[in-house]
């Protein structure tokens, strides 16, 4: 109670619940969107009505978004619930004195954890971070089942197309890529996985997906989905490999994975053919479609994850913030205590009226039987 907490996430109905839970617990909550395209204005207004300070409007542009993040920074939060480390990185670079006063951060995404690890490696992380993304109850479910379903669902809703029989290039086979590939296959599509990590590529192959280099996958792909967390996974040099009427969508962290600006320069003509779908006519007569202007398709072009997934992620974030407030987490990037992970999973199972058995006497492997009792 009384602590200042910044919540920088995709501001929509599920995330709003997290902010209100914290506020109801007595925290002074300030919220902003972690992406300029994902805020739901009606949700932001509802949060304001509940007494939460909000700095975010949908599709206001990057300049306004940057100002919103700095406005949150200027409230001098003690704790940050971050997505992509968007607020944390900006405070480190643009509000250094306020950054030094932060007492802890929980981070939601793979990209954000990587950014915070780099900050730590540079000796610029003076407080504890809980990598919520690395909790089993987050990445095994949110990244895989949540993003997998919501990405494919958004694409099919936007295009009104059939997935069965389609070839789908999936760039990246982390937990997000795994989830997308599984949902594509479940609907009758063929996943063509592109990876730079040979272990992940081999895993995709053993999972039964097609695996190849980027050029091979693009030549076949009806849909091209980026899930790398990096920049320009699809850039100018790749456009010539796209088949005509290929549909591009992004499921990575930001709208930087598909170089839409380069595509606009390359194209001879452009038109918005329907809500969330833009068509580019290339000089050789091929057409290429981009969904949600290259922003996160499941959020900018859909409703995001189901609540049955997000309750797990925000349980991790909320409990993580509580642990930080207790002052028991050491400086640096940390993983949440596995016992807390287990308790969250147990509570989730109980909500479905599922209760687990326990090992009975004689079922555990007793090392004393092999080595003798401790002497």
Language-model features: where?
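Alpha-helix C-terminal capping/helix-to-coil transition sites in glycosyltransferase folds
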Residues: 75-76, 219-220, 244
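ADP-ribose/adenylate-binding Rossmann-like module
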Residues: 33, 79-84, 95-111, 230, ...
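Glycine/serine-rich phosphate-binding loop and adjoining beta1-alpha1 elements at the start
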Residues: 1, 31-166
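A short helix->loop->beta-strand "cap" motif at the edges of active sites that frequently abuts
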Residues: 26-27, 52, 97-100, 125-127, ...
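Adenosine-phosphate binding glycine-rich loop
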Residues: 2-4, 12, 33, 127-165, ...
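Structural alpha-helical scaffold elements that stabilize or flank donor/cofactor-binding regions
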Residues: 72-73, 216-217, 241
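Glycine-rich phosphate/diphosphate-binding loop of Rossmann-like nucleotide-binding domains
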Residues: 9-27, 142, 146-221, 226-228
